[in-house]
Amino acid sequence: MKAEAILRGAAPTYNTTALSLVNDLRTTRKAAPMTNLTLDDMLKERARELNWETTRRTDLIRFGKYEDAWGYKTDADKNKRIFPIPAAERILNPGLQQNFGY
C-alpha cells in the first residue's frame, strides 16, 4: 500500500521510492527486481503477493479495472462496485435506502 501511495503521488518517507519498496519485497521472495514500475505493474504485483487474501475485487475497483473483461468474466455492472445493504439493517434503520441496482 505504501508503494502504491507513493506511485500515485504521495510524499515518500525515508528516501524510499515505490520501486525500491517493491524490489525489497521481490528480493525477499527470490524474484527478479523490476527496473520500472507502473500502476498496472503494481496491480499485478499485488495479485501475486496477496493471492487468496480476498483483496482482488477491491484492488480492481480502486485501479479502475473492475468493469473490464478478464478471464471468464466478460463485464460488470458499475452498480455492483458496492454491496447491497442487508434487509435486517434497513429494518433497524428505516432511514437507510438500498444502494442503487439492488
PLM regions and their residue ranges:
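A generic helix-loop boundary/linker signal
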Residues: 15, 32-33
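Extended, hydrophobic/aromatic-rich amphipathic alpha-helical segments that build helical scaffolds
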Residues: 1-25, 39-53
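Long, intrinsically disordered, low-complexity segments
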Residues: 34-102
